[in-house]
């Protein structure tokens, strides 16, 4: 198995919808949340604001069932394809990326 580089503590983690490849959210994992994700098959992250682990959807029911886990060329960023149940964003939107800044460059 490929080793993820947690030497800086947190690893950016991009979450994609496995059905269509849409970007759902960006969160951070530490080694403990990564291990819990591997063990349970559901996403676990590290909350920088609350300084604690959180299981995505534990409160809302909007869970993320892991389908695939990828790492980048430096092994310090993760991309996880999931089956998303309900919206991924705490605002109720499907994706956390819904604020267009500019287009048509």
From Swiss-Prot:
Subunit structure: Homodimer.
Pathway in which the depicted protein is active: Amino-acid biosynthesis; L-histidine biosynthesis; L-histidine from 5-phospho-alpha-D-ribose 1-diphosphate: step 3/9
Catalytic activity line of the entry: 1-(5-phospho-beta-D-ribosyl)-5'-AMP + H2O = 1-(5-phospho-beta-D-ribosyl)-5-[(5-phospho-beta-D-ribosylamino)methylideneamino]imidazole-4-carboxamide
HAMAP family named in the record: HisI
GO cellular component, one term: cytoplasm
Necessary cofactors: Mg(2+); Zn(2+)
Family: Belongs to the PRA-CH family.
CC cofactor note: Binds 1 Mg(2+) ion per subunit. Binds 1 zinc ion per subunit.
Binding site for Zn(2+): 73, 89, 96
Transmembrane feature ranges: none
UniProt subcellular location: Cytoplasm
EC numbers, comma separated: 3.5.4.19
List of residues binding Mg(2+): 72, 74, 76
Keyword Calcium: no
UniProt GO molecular function: magnesium ion binding; phosphoribosyl-AMP cyclohydrolase activity; zinc ion binding
UniProt main location, coarse: cytoplasm
Keyword annotations of the record: Amino-acid biosynthesis, Cytoplasm, Histidine biosynthesis, Hydrolase, Magnesium, Metal-binding, Zinc
Function as written in the Swiss-Prot or TrEMBL entry: Catalyzes the hydrolysis of the adenine ring of phosphoribosyl-AMP.
Name of this protein: Phosphoribosyl-AMP cyclohydrolase
GO biological process: L-histidine biosynthetic process
């Amino acid at each position: 198995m490929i080793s993820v580089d947690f030497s800086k503590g947190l690893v950016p983690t991009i979450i994609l919808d496995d059905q269509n490849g849409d970007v759902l959210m960006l969160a951070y994992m530490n080694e403990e949340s990564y291990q819990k994700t591997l063990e349970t098959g559901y996403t676990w992250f590290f909350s920088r604001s609350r300084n604690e682990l959180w299981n995505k959807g534990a409160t809302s029911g909007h869970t993320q069932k892991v389908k695939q886990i990828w790492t980048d060329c430096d092994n310090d960023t993760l991309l996880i394809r999931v089956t998303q149940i309900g919206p991924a964003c705490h605002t109720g939107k499907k994706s956390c990326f819904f604020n267009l800044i500019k287009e048509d460059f």
